[in-house]
A protein has these predicted regions:
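Multi-pass alpha-helical transmembrane bundles in non-GPCR membrane proteins
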Residues: 1-135
Length: 135
């Protein structure tokens, strides 16, 4: 696998050089702004602090992806989002629903096949294009 191969998935891409998706790059600031706001508003809530760090990591990883648009950058973008989703799912089950650690982990594990099956089903809808991975 060529980790530095250019990726061209978005209509905004203007060239294969750095910062060739300026609008996508700019929208990543929203993640960083949300992370800072969340950090200061939830000073005593550890779960919110964890999620705010993860929001910032999504902003940074996505900015790298939309700046360089190479395989390595896409991987860290996807991984940062996946870690956030699983962490949020776990924390929501623990804090909102009051589930045990065991049950929260089981739900996280069950999320994998459900997500895989639903994503494969959505691949049949051609109009969704590369956006299927985000649904």
């Amino acid at each position: 696998m060529d980790w530095f191969a250019p990726i061209d998935m978005y209509c905004e891409r203007t060239h294969h050089g750095i910062i060739s998706e300026p609008i996508n790059l700019a929208t990543n600031m929203g993640f960083l702004i949300a992370a800072v706001i969340m950090w200061y508003r939830a000073q005593t809530i550890k779960a919110c602090r964890i999620l705010s760090i993860m929001l910032a990591s999504i902003g940074i990883a996505s900015a790298l992806h939309h700046s360089f648009a190479q395989t390595w950058a896409a991987l860290i973008d996807v991984l940062s989002i996946a870690v956030f989703v699983f962490t949020y799912l776990f924390l929501a089950n623990r804090n909102f629903l009051g589930l045990s650690v065991k049950h929260s982990i089981i739900i996280m594990i069950l999320f994998l096949p459900i997500n895989f099956i639903s994503s494969n089903y959505l691949l049949d809808f051609d109009f969704l294009g590369d956006s299927v991975g985000y649904i």
